């Protein structure tokens, strides 16, 4: 699925209901005392973390979240009903920012299921005239209005909690790999730039769930730094990174120089290069001399700083993919969060 990873929303708590001015009037009680009830409190706006919510698309569709106002007070000492709360469900791994004077001020971070954040408090109820009666004021004419609910502009920024992150140049087989192993079906072709958004997918292998995230190419398409960083952030929580490449057997140095740009970018973003990274050499079925190809692959891996952490796969040969998945599963078992 395409990943909507940020949204700006407006939240507002409901206004408090106003108090009522009323006096008891019955057949044999022409001058009864005050019986104006209080208003209801305005509803609150909450953010809940939800394990079944996977992105922020719903916050792009509905940008305004306004809680219900409290009802006004009524006669016969009847209080108005409180306004209903509004609940915004977000994925686990969402940062919550209040936007004030064009600055993003961190408010909270969702870390587990059903975590709650009160982001806009409803207004306090108004008081009816019955509240103000006293021995010296038996017919109060005063009441109060309900308070206004809080209102804020909020930025939501979601960082996916994946186990394995995929990166590399376009047309290196990342999308094909994701489709072959998981429940995600990204757009695939023999042309570059088909991965334009982060993709998330999951694989159940030997009764173990593995979550993958595939991010677009760092360089191609002339991505600006802020957009590139928006993609790179989804690798932050990964325990393992897979660097997909196509090895040019006719010009190994060209491959190395090209891939060093990816590594430079990776090093520039919050120490991502310190994470375990495996080099995945794709499309090995098109190479004829396997011995020469292996030596070239080893040379490329060493030159990029991966040493012996490289694997060959062919998307036309599921056995090679199954071997890689077994290796990944073993690594994740040995390196639990």
From Swiss-Prot:
* Record keyword Nucleotidyltransferase present: no
- Keywords from the named record: Cytoplasm, GTP-binding, Hydrolase, Magnesium, Metal-binding, Nucleotide-binding
Which GO molecular function terms does the record list? GTP binding; GTPase activity; magnesium ion binding
Give any Gene Ontology cellular component. cytoplasm
Q: Please give the cofactor(s) recorded in the UniProt entry for this protein.
A: Mg(2+)
Domain OBG-type G residues, every copy: 162-333
Main localization of the protein?
cytoplasm
* Ranges of residues in domain Obg: 1-161
- EC number(s) from the headed UniProt entry: 3.6.5.-
User: What HAMAP family does the record tag this protein with?
Assistant: GTPase_Obg
Subunit structure comment from the entry: Monomer.
Recorded hits in PANTHER family, A to Z, give: DEVELOPMENTALLY REGULATED GTP-BINDING PROTEIN-RELATED, MITOCHONDRIAL RIBOSOME-ASSOCIATED GTPASE 2
Described function: An essential GTPase which binds GTP, GDP and possibly (p)ppGpp with moderate affinity, with high nucleotide exchange rates and a fairly low GTP hydrolysis rate. Plays a role in control of the cell cycle, stress response, ribosome biogenesis and in those bacteria that undergo differentiation, in morphogenesis control.
Q: What is this protein called?
A: GTPase Obg
Protein's organism: Wigglesworthia glossinidia brevipalpis
Q: Which gene encodes it?
A: obg
């Amino acid at each position: 699925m395409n990943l909507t990873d940020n949204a700006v929303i407006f939240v507002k708590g409901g206004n408090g209901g106003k108090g009522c001015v009323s006096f008891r009037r019955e057949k044999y009680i022409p001058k009864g005392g005050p019986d104006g009830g209080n208003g209801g409190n305005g509803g609150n706006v909450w953010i809940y973390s939800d394990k079944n919510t996977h992105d922020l698309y719903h916050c792009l569709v509905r940008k305004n979240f306004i809680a219900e106002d409290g009802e006004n007070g009524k006669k016969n000492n009847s209080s108005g009903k409180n306004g209903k709360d509004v609940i915004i469900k977000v994925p686990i791994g969402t940062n919550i920012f209040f936007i004030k004077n064009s600055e993003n001020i961190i408010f909270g971070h969702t870390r587990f299921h059903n975590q709650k954040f009160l982001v806009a408090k409803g207004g306090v109820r108004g008081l009816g005239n019955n509240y103000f009666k006293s021995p010296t004021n038996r017919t109060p004419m005063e009441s109060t209005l309900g308070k206004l609910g809080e209102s804020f502009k909020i930025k939501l920024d979601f960082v996916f909690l994946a186990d394995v992150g995929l990166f590399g140049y376009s047309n290196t087989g990342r999308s094909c790999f994701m489709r072959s192993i998981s429940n995600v079906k990204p757009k695939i072709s023999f042309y570059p730039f088909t991965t334009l958004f982060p993709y998330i997918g999951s694989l159940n292998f030997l009764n173990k769930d593995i979550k993958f995230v595939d991010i677009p190419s760092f360089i191609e398409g002339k991505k600006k730094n802020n957009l590139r960083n928006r993609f790179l952030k989804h690798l932050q929580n990964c325990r393992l990174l897979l660097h997909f490449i196509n090895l040019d057997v006719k010009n190994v140095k060209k491959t190395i120089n090209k891939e060093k740009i990816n590594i430079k970018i990776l090093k520039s973003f919050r120490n991502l290069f310190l994470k375990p990274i495996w080099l995945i050499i794709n499309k090995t079925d098109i190479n004829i001399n396997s011995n020469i190809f292996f030596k070239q692959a080893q040379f490329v891996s060493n030159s990029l700083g991966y040493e012996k952490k490289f694997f060959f796969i062919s998307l036309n040969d599921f056995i090679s993919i199954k071997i890689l998945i077994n290796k990944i599963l073993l690594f994740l078992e040995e390196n639990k969060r």
